[in-house]
């Protein structure tokens, strides 16, 4: 079934696909519900969470605490664990019946599989891996004026436009592209985890949230795969998004790569519970694994403390860390762009400065 421009006016509400794992919501759900609340307010529509699973009604109210007006729970034993065929079938069936205007999906492994499949079935567009969303044109223009190097002073914008404006990195993060889907609905977007700020939980809003449970039907013909068992692999992956302290390294460690990484690890340990990140140049050079990358093509982070060691500060990197509460930069080049967004900047050789930082932190803790 395809929806086109003739049907657009019949579509209502902002939807967020909420991902559960083993009966528990994930942090990305709360980020998207929080962002969806802003978009729904801009559009003057309701915010609806769509939750697929089995016996997950009890966790649905939590989504209301972050802004959902309503949560639709689709319940079936085969939805307990994610499978492409079951989830795509159920989600598309509900969408075709309810006709949401916008669907936001987290750009997780599951979301990146589910989103494109549903968009293809619904014959609509999907913008993947978004880092910014707007409906109100005034807010979009404000975003451009503060986050773009473009001179927009002579540009004109259709201020009456109410399409969802979806911004995402393009060409390896060298450009930011804003995409709209004006002729088809629903408008679909996958959103990068960690880029949207989670709102404060409200118990009052949670109690006011309406939860509607739908017991769906799935036939054997609908199910091409079946989850028999899940075996979890023990793998150490750095959690950049959830970290409160991040010490990142850049190309400035090139004269002694292993020594530079070791210094970053020692500094992170000195702070306490810090983790090590890296710029794209570091990851592309193979000095750190890909899950350590900070920036538009890596993770977007906002820790309490972000330390940039030997990072020049390309716009792609700054876009992924500039919302950190406190930014400390160390670079031997006093003109490095990283200093433009740093709260504290130190010009000099990081191999000499970082040991002094470590000693100062230890002395402060022992005082």
UniProtKB/Swiss-Prot annotation:
Main location group: cytoplasm
Assembly behavior: Heterohexadecamer; tetramer of tetramers. Each tetramer is composed of 2 alpha (AcrC), a beta (AcrA) and a gamma (AcrB) subunit.
Any Pfam family: ETF_alpha
UniProt similarity note: Belongs to the ETF alpha-subunit/FixB family.
Any one GO BP annotation for this protein: fatty acid beta-oxidation using acyl-CoA dehydrogenase
Protein name: Acryloyl-CoA reductase electron transfer subunit beta
Spans through the membrane: none
Biological role: Part of the ETF-acryloyl-CoA reductase complex involved in the pathway of L-alanine fermentation. The electron transfer flavoprotein (ETF) serves as a specific electron acceptor for acryloyl-CoA reductase.
Gene3D superfamilies assigned to the protein according to its UniProt record, in alphabetical order: HUPs, TPP-binding domain
Organism: Anaerotignum propionicum (Clostridium propionicum)
Entry GO CC: cytoplasm
InterPro entries associated with the record: DHS-like_NAD/FAD-binding_dom (IPR029035), ETF_a/b_N (IPR014730), ETF_a/FixB (IPR001308), ETF_alpha_N (IPR033947), ETF_asu_C (IPR014731), ETF_beta (IPR050041), Rossmann-like_a/b/a_fold (IPR014729)
